[in-house]
Amino acid sequence: MILEEVYEIIKQRIKEKPEGSYVAKLTTDDKKTAINKICEKIGEESTELILAAKDDKKDEIIYEAADLIFHTMVLLAYKNIEFEELLKEFERRKK
């Protein structure tokens, strides 16, 4: 599944902090600053998704939804939450 692959790349970049990596840039500072940066991006992407939806722009909705999901995955990985834990929560809600 592509989301799991992306999640593993995010985890790797948080750990290894390769030069030029956007994820590394978001997560390199002290924990409080890193969390603030990540949460600001989630807020920004949420707003952009809402605006795209209100404007009924399908392409923008898809683009902004992908951005929101990506930054949420960065937050989860930064907080050491495994992707499988998220999937288990969806499974629990399915019942």
Swiss-Prot record:
Q: What is its main location?
A: cytoplasm
Is Hydrolase a UniProt keyword of this protein?
Answer: yes
* One matching Pfam family: PRA-PH
- Which reaction(s) does the protein catalyse, per the Swiss-Prot or TrEMBL entry? 1-(5-phospho-beta-D-ribosyl)-ATP + H2O = 1-(5-phospho-beta-D-ribosyl)-5'-AMP + diphosphate + H(+)
Q: What family is this protein classified in?
A: Belongs to the PRA-PH family.
For this UniProt entry, the molecular function terms from Gene Ontology, in alphabetical order, are:
ATP binding; phosphoribosyl-ATP diphosphatase activity
Q: Keywords of this protein's UniProt record, alphabetized?
A: Amino-acid biosynthesis, ATP-binding, Cytoplasm, Histidine biosynthesis, Hydrolase, Nucleotide-binding
Catalytic activity, EC? 3.6.1.31
- What is the protein's given name? Phosphoribosyl-ATP pyrophosphatase
Task: Please cite one Gene Ontology biological process associated with this protein.
Answer: L-histidine biosynthetic process
UniProt keyword annotation of ATP-binding present: yes
Gene Ontology CC? cytoplasm
Which locations, inside or outside the cell, does it occupy?
Cytoplasm
Q: Which InterPro entries match?
A: HisE, PRib-ATP_PPHydrolase-like
Annotated pathway, please?
Amino-acid biosynthesis; L-histidine biosynthesis; L-histidine from 5-phospho-alpha-D-ribose 1-diphosphate: step 2/9
